[in-house]
UniProtKB/Swiss-Prot annotation:
Protein name listed in UniProt: Pertactin autotransporter
Range of residues in the leader sequence: 1-34
PROSITE patterns: AUTOTRANSPORTER
Gene Ontology CC, one term: extracellular region
Sequence repeats: 266-270, 271-275, 276-280, 281-285
Keyword flag Signal: yes
Domain notes: The signal peptide, cleaved at the inner membrane, guides the autotransporter protein to the periplasmic space. Then, insertion of the C-terminal translocator domain in the outer membrane forms a hydrophilic pore for the translocation of the passenger domain to the bacterial cell surface, with subsequent cleavage.
Region (Disordered) residue spans: 561-619
Pro residues bias locations: 568-613
Alphabetical GO biological process terms: cell adhesion
Region of interest: 4 X 5 AA tandem repeats of G-G-A-V-P: 266-290
Species in which this protein is naturally found: Bordetella parapertussis (strain 12822 / ATCC BAA-587 / NCTC 13253)
Residues forming coiled coils: none
């Protein structure tokens, strides 16, 4: 029975050919044969193929749907196509082979499915080579010849030899899986004729895997002038690489992910090592590790792809003549090298040609080394189009391969690209509208900057870890971002050894610490007489360092340093010529002096606290700290809260013998000059609530009550930023109103003040500081009203207020140490109020008035220290005050009051103050 089945299967091709010839004689189109549909074909003999379409079988389309093919004989292939005019459509079936296929005698490859001529269309199929051998004997699909084509979709191709395409064949694989042996395109150069057309392979959303047991050097291996296009999918494994392109290959990878998978470390292959320590196909020693993409004398383009490398190896290895372009996507080698140059194809050393690696269109690369040059071959690395690279650029000092010439390592950063790392290996570096973040000491041969290209000395994690950039030549125009460590007397430095030219800017990060000694910090050293110029890019051309600001100055010897931004001293008058002295008579010798008794040791006086040098400009943080601290600021808030009796209680005389509850709001603009910091403005606003009880006594009455309120002060430091204070206060008061017109008012308040500031330093970064303090104050006001019968009145007033605020210590965000020592204020006021009481219908009254006062601050001084340097703040002085207001009794215990004031003094001015309040009396 088995013999009969074998004869039937073997005879089928002949009958199909005869039928095709008959139809052709009648002028009919070639038919689609269906003889292999839903069949199970099993063969065990040598070269007993499952389906064999010979060149003599004629043209046409054959189909095999739902068919299972199993062959096990030596050189037996499940499907063999040798007719260039034939097409086999294989759907929903499987083809399996298990016999030895490789012909050692003629070095001929065979596969479970072999296409030498014609076209194979496989859909939802499984092509598997299950032989227990590897590599050459384990090919699942072999397509070879310029008349050979294959189109695979939604299928699985499995075998230790994977899929092999060569000799001008064209293959397309969509939404499929290639497992075990990977994909091989092309043959080794000695086996490939020079005039052979290139093979072309297209993979779409296809997964390719090469397991270690297969011995495949790469999951995808393209050799010679062949072309591979990948759009989507995963490439995993490979003994030494994920994708290898050598000897003229062209590879396009788009939306691909390349990973090593579970391959053993070091590229070791189970079952033994390759003789000579090299991987077939020209790979370097296995000790080099695994490479995501290995390129030599070929072109590889990666677009929006992901390449991940393990600890040993690199994401990309570029050998001689490699041209690699990475557009978008990412290259990752967290424990190794992103790019390694100077390897690959070492068995075939062509003349050395420049290696070109370009990262562009937002590509990201990260590793311990961004580029590791193994051999001294010419290398050009370019980052452009917003690409970001992280890792050092380093080179080994290995001897070159015989016949290979050495060349420079050139790096170009352009179009908003960014490289973060250090180097001692770069011969030339150009930075054009891009940034190099230098993480450690570095040496560069020629450095050229253009279009705001910048070198950013990375801010260190530890103080004192300054960096030095040494270059042979400097040219162009760019920006250097640098750090200073003032308390250690250290800073980042740029050192030019041979020649410096161009106009450059230095941007120096602010430092909250104070210089250790002197006022000079060296930043740039150039050869004497060089043409390069440097300016500060910080705001206003100054740098905030500790308490003061510094500017950049050259000393004429090629050194550029930061010096204190100090006003130049007034020139001394030239000495006037005087009479020339005549000859002096000789002086007689002096008699010897008797020895002096020893003096007792004198006690050395304590060193005074450092004082601010005259004319020095405060840094933004120090200025904010000085203007936020001291008694001056706190006292202005406290006086805005207390103010005069009439603004707190309205006109108590309008509702005699009545206690009540009241509330008021106020707003005020202040202009302060405390003589230590720069002038600043402050807007104060708040409210206050209170209630009192009236107690009648002989000749008048007392109002005894309590109060509570909230005040906010918002400060603006011109050109720097601002700050604010939140004040919450409680207190009590006692007010005496005499029938004779005399009054006396006493208050006691306790306040809690929350102070903070946020300013922009000269480097543009925000500096914050905050602290809490407390204050307490008392006031006593007295006066007497002289009233006229027609309602006019005249009221002289006198007031004395004493306020004491505590201090606080804190450290600003930039490290500036601040200590506010608090202080006291004693304010006196003499005033005169003139107004008129107007009676209205229904018992209502209106009382407008104007007032003039003179105020004298008798103390108002405090000390604020920044990094131990004392700054004396004080508002002592006289100011005048003018005001007008009105109080109104609306009947039934309701009254309103409002006022406006203007005050002017040399240290404190108040362009406007508004009060408004309401009182209900019972």
């Amino acid at each position: 029975m088995n013999m009969s089945l074998s004869r039937i299967v073997k005879a089928a091709p002949l009958r199909r050919t005869t039928l095709a010839m008959a139809l052709g004689a009648l002028g009919a189109a070639p038919a689609a044969y269906a003889d292999w549909n839903n069949q199970s074909i099993i063969k065990a003999g040598e070269r007993q193929h499952g389906i064999h379409i010979k060149q003599s079988d004629g043209a046409g389309v054959r189909t095999a749907t739902g068919t299972t093919i199993k062959v096990s004989g030596r050189q037996a292939q499940g499907v063999l196509l040798e007719n260039p005019a034939a097409e086999l459509r294989f759907q929903n079936g499987s083809v399996t082979s298990s016999g030895q296929l490789f012909d050692e005698g003629v070095r001929r490859f065979l596969g479970t499915v072999t296409v030498k001529a014609g076209k194979l269309v496989a859909d939802h199929a499984t092509l598997a080579n299950v032989s227990d051998t590897r590599d050459d004997d384990g090919i699942a699909l072999y397509v070879a010849g310029e008349q050979a084509q294959a189109s695979i979709a939604d299928s699985t191709l499995q075998g230790a030899g994977g899929v092999r395409v060569e000799r001008g064949a064209n293959v397309t694989v969509q939404r499929s899986t290639i497992v075990d042996g990977g994909l091989h395109i092309g043959t080794l150069q000695p086996l490939q004729p020079e005039d052979l057309p290139p093979s072309r392979v297209v993979l779409g959303d296809t997964s390719v895997t090469a397991v270690p047991a297969s011995g495949a050097p790469a999951a995808v291996f393209v050799f010679g002038a062949n072309e591979l296009t990948v759009d989507g999918g995963h490439i995993t494994g490979g003994r030494a690489a994920g994708v290898a392109a050598m000897d003229g290959a062209i590879v396009h990878l788009q939306r691909a992910t390349i990973r090593r998978g579970d391959a053993p470390a070091g590229g070791a292959v189970p079952g033994g090592a390759v003789p000579g320590g090299a991987v077939p196909g020209g790979f370097g020693p296995l000790l080099d590790g695994w490479y995501g993409v290995d390129v030599s004398d070929s072109t590889v383009d990666l677009a929006q792809s992901i390449v991940e490398a393990p600890q040993l190896g690199a994401a990309i290895r570029a050998g001689r003549g490699a041209r690699v372009t990475v557009s978008g996507g990412s290259l990752s080698a967290p424990h190794g090298n992103v790019i390694e140059t100077g390897g690959g194809a070492r068995r075939f050393p062509p003349p050395a040609s420049p290696l070109s690696i370009t990262l562009q269109a937002g590509a990201r690369a990260q590793g311990r080394a961004l580029l590791y040059r193994v051999l001294p071959e010419p290398v050009k690395l370019t980052l452009a189009g917003g690409a970001q690279g992280q890792g050092d650029i380093v080179a080994t000092e290995l001897p070159p391969i015989p016949g290979a010439s050495s060349g420079p390592l050139d790096v170009a950063l352009a179009s908003q690209a960014r490289w973060t790392g250090a180097t001692r290996a770069v011969d030339s570096l150009s930075i054009d509208n891009a940034t190099w973040v230098m993480t450690d000491n570095s040496n560069v041969g020629a450095l050229r900057l253009a279009s705001d290209g910048s070198v950013d000395f990375q801010q260190p994690a530890e103080a004192g870890r300054f960096k030095v950039l040494m270059v042979d030549t400097l040219a162009g125009s760019g920006l250097f971002r640098m750090n200073v460590f003032a308390d250690l007397g250290l800073s980042d430095k740029l050192v030019v050894m041979r020649d410096a030219s161009g106009q450059h800017r230095l941007w120096v990060r602010n430092s909250g610490s104070e210089p250790a000694s002197g006022n000079t910090m060296l930043l740039v050293q150039t050869p004497r007489g060089s043409a390069a110029t440097f300016t500060l890019a910080n705001k206003d051309g100054k740098v905030d360092i500790g308490t003061y600001r510094y500017r950049l100055a050259a000393n004429g010897n090629g050194q550029w340093s930061l010096v204190g931004a100090k006003a130049p001293p007034a020139p001394k008058p030239a000495p006037q010529p005087g009479p020339q002295p005549g000859p002096q008579p000789p002086q007689p010798p002096q008699p010897p002096q008797p020895p002096q008794p020893p003096q007792p040791p004198q006690r050395q006086p304590e060193a005074p606290a450092p004082q601010p040098p005259a004319g020095r400009e405060l840094s933004a943080a120090a200025n904010a700290a000085v203007n936020t601290g001291g008694v001056g600021l706190a006292s202005t808030l406290w006086y805005a809260e207390s103010n005069a009796l009439s603004k707190r209680l309205g006109e108590l005389r309008l509702n005699p013998d009545a206690g009540g509850a009241w509330g008021r709001g106020f707003a005020q603009r202040q202009q302060l000059d405390n003589r230590a910091g720069r002038r600043f403005d402050q807007k104060v606003a708040g409210f206050e609530l209170g209630a009192d009880h009236a107690v009648a006594v002989a000749g008048g009455r007392w109002h005894l009550g309590g109060l509570a309120g909230y005040t906010r002060g918002d400060r603006g430091f011109t050109g720097d930023g601002g700050g604010h204070t939140d004040s919450v206060h409680v207190g009590g008061y006692a007010t005496y109103i005499a029938n004779s017109g005399f009054y006396l008012d006493a208050t006691l308040r306790a306040s809690r003040l929350e102070n903070d500031f946020k300013v922009a330093g000269s480097d543009g970064y925000a500096v914050k500081g905050k602290y809490r303090t407390h204050g307490v104050g008392v006031s006593l006001e007295a006066g007497r009203r002289f009233a006229h019968a027609d309602g006019w009145f005249l009221e002289p007033q006198a007031e004395l207020a004493v306020f004491r605020v505590g201090g606080g210590a804190y450290r600003a965000a930039n490290g500036l140490r601040v200590r506010d020592e608090g202080g006291s204020s004693v304010l006196g006021r003499l005033g005169l109020e003139v107004g008129k009481r107007i009676e209205l219908a229904g018992g209502r009254q209106v009382q407008p008035y104007i007032k003039a006062s003179v105020l004298q601050e008798f103390d108002g001084a405090g000390t604020v220290r920044t990094n131990g340097i004392a700054h004396r703040t004080e508002l002592r002085g006289t100011r005048a005050e003018l005001g007008l207001g009105m109080a109104a009794a609306l009947g039934r215990g309701h009254s309103l009051y409002a006022s406006y004031e203007y005050s002017k003094g040399p240290k404190l001015a108040m362009p406007w103050t508004f009060h408004a309040g309401y009182r209900y009396s019972w």
